[in-house]
């Protein structure tokens, strides 16, 4: 019994004297955000990731404006291809709120990604690009401008689909409380103002090219005319009868009772859109 007590005492002393940080070690080969921005090549791959969220305009499934209306009808009901196009199902009156088609809010049902995930990656890029070593300042400014335009475009696409949406200026930190995570929706005018703000910053920076000079390596990259086109589309949408004095949306208000859609027609919106 005495030997047993000695043994337990020694074991207890060994445990208490162990290095406290022995198990507090990050395993090797674990990817971190720092690794994505520790050189130009990895940062450029992250830039490409920010681009991957762009919906395909020419894709009949991903672009709701092609088949979701009643401008185009396909009469062969037994055609396998058309019966499986989610946008065509919207035109047939099958859209629903519990499991919506073309769900760019969460991703799925014809939408390859959540655009809010795209906005999160854009914010990560903007927050970390400054730390990339060996990157020419001219190229850094161009990449920043491109991702700002992507942020503006993703906000515009969500606005066009859902009306008032939350503005995602910055990412929430991982330890955010429940209250901090419940981001309220902003008004249509606020969202459009933010889109214009981002594009105006890009225009003022003069960082974007007017045309793509190297087609084989830069085809599809954002140019200055593309950025201005997004701004114009956003301003026209804000000036349109849908969001400019539309009293049918008078009950669309925030938690404080503020209207999320402009209830008084404003002619100046068309002046801004010209």
Residue ranges and their predicted role:
Residues 18-69, 253:
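Membrane-proximal, proline-rich intrinsically disordered regions
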Residues 220-230:
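Amphipathic alpha-helical protein-interaction segments enriched in hydrophobic
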Residues 1-28:
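Bacterial Sec-dependent N-terminal signal peptides
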Residues 237-239, 268-274:
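Polar, glycine-rich mid-to-C-terminal structural blocks
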Residues 44, 48, 52-62, 82-162, ...:
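Conserved, well-structured interaction surfaces
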Residues 151-152, 231-233:
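Extended amphipathic alpha-helical segments enriched in small hydrophobics
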Residues 245-265:
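A solvent-exposed, charged loop/short amphipathic helix patch at secondary-structure junctions
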Residues 159-160, 166, 237-246:
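Short coil/turn linking the two alpha-helices of tandem helical-hairpin repeats
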């Amino acid at each position: 019994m005495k030997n047993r007590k000695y043994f337990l005492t020694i074991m207890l002393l060994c445990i208490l004297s162990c290095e406290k940080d022995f198990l507090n070690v990050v395993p090797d080969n674990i990817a971190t955000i720092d690794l994505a921005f520790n050189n130009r090549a990895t940062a450029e791959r992250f830039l490409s990731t920010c681009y991957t969220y762009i919906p395909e305009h020419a894709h009949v499934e991903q672009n709701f404006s092609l088949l979701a209306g009643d401008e185009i009808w396909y009469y062969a009901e037994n055609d396998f291809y058309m019966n499986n196009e989610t946008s065509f199902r919207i035109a047939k009156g099958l859209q629903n709120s519990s499991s919506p088609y073309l769900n760019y809010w969460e991703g799925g049902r014809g939408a390859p990604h959540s655009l809010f995930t795209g906005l999160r990656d854009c914010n990560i890029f903007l927050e970390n690009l400054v730390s990339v070593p060996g990157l020419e300042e001219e190229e850094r400014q161009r990449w920043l401008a491109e991702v700002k335009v992507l942020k503006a475009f993703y906000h515009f696409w969500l606005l066009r689909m859902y009306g008032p949406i939350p503005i995602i200026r910055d990412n929430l930190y991982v330890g955010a409380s429940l209250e901090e995570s419940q981001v309220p929706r902003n008004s249509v005018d606020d969202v459009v103002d933010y889109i214009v703000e981002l594009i105006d910053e890009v225009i003022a920076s003069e960082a974007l090219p007017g045309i793509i000079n190297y087609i084989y390596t830069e085809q599809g990259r954002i140019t200055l005319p593309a950025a201005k086109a997004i701004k114009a589309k956003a301003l026209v949408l804000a000036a349109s009868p849908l969001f400019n004095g539309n009293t049918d949306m008078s009950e669309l208000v925030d938690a404080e009772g503020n209207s999320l859609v402009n209830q008084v027609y404003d002619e100046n919106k068309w002046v801004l859109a010209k």
